[in-house]
Amino acid sequence: MSNMEKHLFNLKFAAKELNRNAKKCDKEEKAEKAKIKKAIQKGNTEVARIHAENAIRQKNQAINFLRMSARVDAVAARVQTAVTMGKVTKSMAGVVKSMDATLRSMNLEKISALMDKFEHQFETLDVQTQQMEDTMSSTTTLTTPQNQVDMLLQEMADEAGLDLNMELPQGQTGSVGASVASTEQDELSQRLARLRDQV
């Protein structure tokens, strides 16, 4: 196993660890919510408020861990592509060397700064890999197509028997279906234009 592969393993491990921390925070949030109910039942509003603050703090922490886990995971996928293509630059290798201790610390600020460095390295790599990504499915990009996210959210809401529009901020209701429809319309228009060009 090369050094770069070891670092790649560490990145993937860190993403899982961050994910585990998010789940731990979720569990803590649920425990705090149970304590809120008990305190309210006893008529102790002040204690309930403290547990509510704790629950919100745990929820926010879980979101932060999840967000960072996804970011580290995306960078790991980009490193994997770079390793596969043999496009690991010296500056990228330098950033990778400094990461092991940072990832072990589970300090979100330090990890975020490290991910910033990585993403900067990948901006230059992106230009080189664009042709390859055009021929492959772009599963390694850092961003996810919004319409796919919206469709999955709608699908999950339907499965759970929930109305997704209730969760959307005002003014955005119905945007899920509309964005999917407009994307499909764009794709159809492009296909039609290509067919006309061929004739």
UniProtKB/Swiss-Prot annotation:
Query: Could you tell me which residues belong to the region Interaction with VPS4B?
Result: 183-199
Share an example GO biological-process annotation for this protein: nuclear membrane reassembly
Q: Where is this region: Interaction with VPS4A, MITD1 and STAMBP?
A: 180-196
> Which positions are tagged coiled coil?
15-47, 177-199
Q: Where is this motif: MIT-interacting motif?
A: 186-196
Q: Write out the annotated subcellular location.
A: Cytoplasm, Cytosol; Endosome; Late endosome membrane
For this UniProt record, give its keywords in alphabetical order, as a comma-separated list.
Cell cycle, Cell division, Coiled coil, Cytoplasm, Endosome, Membrane, Protein transport, Transport
Q: How is the protein disposed in the membrane?
A: Peripheral membrane protein
Region described as Interaction with VTA1: 180-199
Is Cytoplasm tagged as a keyword? yes
Kindly list the GO CC terms recorded for this protein. amphisome membrane; autophagosome membrane; cytosol; kinetochore; kinetochore microtubule; lysosomal membrane; midbody; multivesicular body membrane
Assembly and binders: Probable peripherally associated component of the endosomal sorting required for transport complex III (ESCRT-III). ESCRT-III components are thought to multimerize to form a flat lattice on the perimeter membrane of the endosome. Several assembly forms of ESCRT-III may exist that interact and act sequentially. Interacts with CHMP1A. Interacts with VTA1; the interaction probably involves the open conformation of CHMP1B. Interacts with CHMP2A. Interacts with VPS4A; the interaction is direct. Interacts with VPS4B; the interaction is direct.
Assigned protein family: Belongs to the SNF7 family.
Q: What protein is this chain from?
A: Charged multivesicular body protein 1B2
* Source taxonomy: Eukaryota, Metazoa, Chordata, Craniata, Vertebrata
